[in-house]
């Protein structure tokens, strides 16, 4: 028999573990560490917003069903008025069900009451989760497009500033022919312009919805519901689907982000090379009080550009993972889910951070025209 003191001890231990896990779950904002997370993008990928987007899909489906007479209109109104969720409560239920969407629906039902029987009618989990993730990818792309457009303008402004600043062009790392520093920056601007077009296309590719039920046959839901929900949420219904939206879309999205990250790394690497002591034709802004080394106080290191180079490697790795997700068993499996929970937030948070960071670097970039002229003379004017 369990002694009286032992029971109380075990009860306290269990309660402490559950409370700690609840706290960790509530505090979990994104997979990317806070150091590289900007607030707007971080909120977009928060647990709270993910469930809110899923709820938006469910409510839009109920509204559409009510409009078509498939559920009572009063029920749809009641669902929209009362439907809410609690992140802690969802996690508490999930610890029993081991199914996040069922946990979510159970929590919503606790708030809605009798009319909750109409929520999720004819749908499968992937209908709401895939559609919600597509909205989040679309919104993330909008943030990144805004970042890139601002970066493009900074590059154009500085390209004009240095349009008459001669410097030596280098091929194979060796002096080649004279050019202008403005031309170098204009080249970067042109590549960012292409990246903007790529992201716009990637945004369109993932701006889709799927509400066709298990294995995508519409066996328990009218195809009109999908059309109506898509219109409400600003998404296009996919032409064909299995139980999931096909992952070539997600792969193209993540791969596009990796290409843009590589463009940023290309620019950052050039700044790093130009900042080398041997060249020092340009360098990152060094703020008052900034230090370069704990052992060598003379150091002025291109740490921000180095950070961008490192983070580009992460996104290229994420692109490989996204392509691995294209292959699923038969009409679906769930092997993609654990990958996407990490790479979709990480990739977009990473790119948002790096684009903003590099925009600031180029905006404040210190350029030394006299050193450029000096270096041109090292080859005797050839």
Q: Can you describe what each PLM-predicted range is?
A:
Residues 64, 107, 111, 154, ...:
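Generic, well-ordered alpha-helical scaffold segments in large soluble proteins
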Residues 13-14, 20-31:
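Short, Lys/Arg-enriched N-terminal segments with co-localized hydrophobic residues
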Residues 138-149, 156, 186-189, 193, ...:
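Short amphipathic alpha-helical segments with heptad-repeat character
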Residues 226, 232-319:
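Acidic, glycine-rich loop-and-beta core segments that form the ion-binding/anion-interacting portion
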Residues 26-212, 218, 222-228, 232, ...:
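A helix-coil-helix interface module used to build multimeric assemblies
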Residues 73-76, 279-286, 359-373:
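A glycine-biased, small/acidic residue-tolerant capping/turn segment at secondary-structure junctions
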Residues 2-10:
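Extreme N-terminal basic, low-complexity initiation segments
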Residues 28-53, 93-97, 114, 296-382:
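Glycine-rich cofactor/substrate-binding loops
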